Amino acid sequence: MRFFIILFLFFFQCSFSQIVYESIESEALGTTRELKIQLPRNYELNSDQFYPLIVVFDGDYLFEVVAGNVEYISYWRDMPDAIVVGINQAKSRTEDTTLSVEDHFPYRSGAKFYEFIDSELIEFIESKYRCSDFRIAIGHGETANYINYFFFQKSPLFNGFVALSPSFAPFMQENLVRKLRIEQKKQVKLFYYLSTASLDIKRNQKQATELNYKISTIENPSIFYEFDNFEGLSHYSLVPRSIPNALDNMFSVYQPINRDEYEKNILTLVSSPVDYLVDKYETIKDLFGIEKQILINDFKAIAAAIEKNKQYDFYKDLGDIARKHHPETVLGFYYLARFFEETGKPKKAMNAYRSSYTLGSIQGYSKDEMLDRADAIQKEFGY
């Protein structure tokens, strides 16, 4: 079954995305490194769009898994289109991840590889491709441990870290927990995903579960953390299960409002649900550099909360935003009319419904319904 899933992702990827193979001359390493790069569909057409950058260590075997998932998930708009870069390390993995026996930080060839990533690779990619400031690092085993050294930077090079069955260096858990506690004082959002499995390398599973316990005690609204401990999977088979979960965690704010978000975050608000909607899309813009049009699904979720909690005054603000994001449709006038209806201004409600006559219908809101509502008000009040 796993074979067919991977085969499907491969053909799905090949059908839509553009794969580029690049070589980069590295002064830090004194050699050439091979890269695999997946560009988003319609990359050339969307010439003004900038994209999140996902850097995949162990690109020899991880790149296709990550690229296929990115292509599939972004197709359904549960994450933005992204640029995926895989670093081939089959012949240099041991040298790339070399650590000091004293402080267990990158050393010699490991330090050179760190410099390559920090000072050369990102600049090389961003000089050739349109990347936003949002970056994710993905590693497996030794490289899952290695990516954490970028997390320790004062201003981390990456916003998101995906550690798949990490083979932690000594003191790595303590250093991570200490760093996470320091980040409590900052407002910068960081994402961290950690996974292991019941059939994982025993040392890796033990350390991952211990780290998860420690991280779970930290209350930090700026850190978006997710942990998976899969049953019946091994060090290698956990990878294709982890990647979609990790991406879901990294890009959860980008996704349409679902039932869980609606019930836990919106219905329970004591403040404005409209402000929540605005903040959600401002966060998308700030994190990913994307001006995303507010989805009809999300307008409907906020409207449902207004109705459920009888907070009808918020309909006016919702209508103003709807007219800004969907000006050619009846949506904004519908919410404005509902505001007038529920605040004792039926004549203004009738006029608002009728103002939508020249506008287009949209996902359950038709101009015929608007006119029917206007006629019903006219009949009831005798205007």
Walk through the language-model features, giving the residues of each.
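Bacterial Sec-dependent N-terminal signal peptides
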Residues: M1-V20
